[in-house]
Swiss-Prot record:
PANTHER family: BNAANNG28850D PROTEIN, CYSTATIN/MONELLIN SUPERFAMILY PROTEIN. Coiled coil: none annotated. It holds the Pfam family protein_MS5. InterPro entries: MS5. It comes from Arabidopsis thaliana (Mouse-ear cress). This is UPF0725 protein At4g17990. Belongs to the UPF0725 (EMB2204) family.
Amino acid sequence: MEDDEKCREFWSRVAESQGFDVEHLMDDKPKSCLLDYQNSDFDTEVFLNAKLGIHKYNMLQGTNLQLSCIEKCNSRITTVCIGYYITLVAKDPSAGGSLVTFQTKVVHEDYSKINTLTVYLARLKSQPPPDEEIGGAKTGLGSSILGTCIHPCKSVSSKSVETEENVKQPNERLKARNAVFYIRYRYYPNKGRAPKGNGHKPPRDRIAIIKRTMDIQGLLTLEFDTRYAKTLL
């Protein structure tokens, strides 16, 4: 009972900053509370989530913020998902390269070969917390996001987009609220690895299928269908 009370108190204090500023709580964190704090050596997935949060904000606000560096990332693990609470520094080229502190919350879910990334929050840290952690976005899927999603790869060789929305110009399909992207790319299975057995495996072509949806509240979700990840084209 005492441990349960400590956990409730801990999560209550985490919620006060919406999961972002928790480093002062980590020394007293109960062992049963699965929250990880990181301020260096971020992996590829953290960078992907940071870029995705900035991407949503740019398309919503009409800005062109660019990732400069990541300050910290808190990740909360549950039985069904991982929530990333990322504080980063973004550069604003339109303001002479000035730097702004940015926060984004991205949730990663994995359901039997279907992986989803959902952006619940994307904002400047100086902005007041919204009543709900959901914001609208008129977003496209930028090439920087594509390049990170299919790591490790050398290059994207072709892309196609399907949407049921009434879009006249082909390039406008990238901005459709609901669309399916088919990306063919060159995959290097031994990139960054030491040779084993008979040596390196040759590069091969693969296909990535990414579905983007936005509900009536503007919640941005990317769904990755990995069932075709090993399909050779």
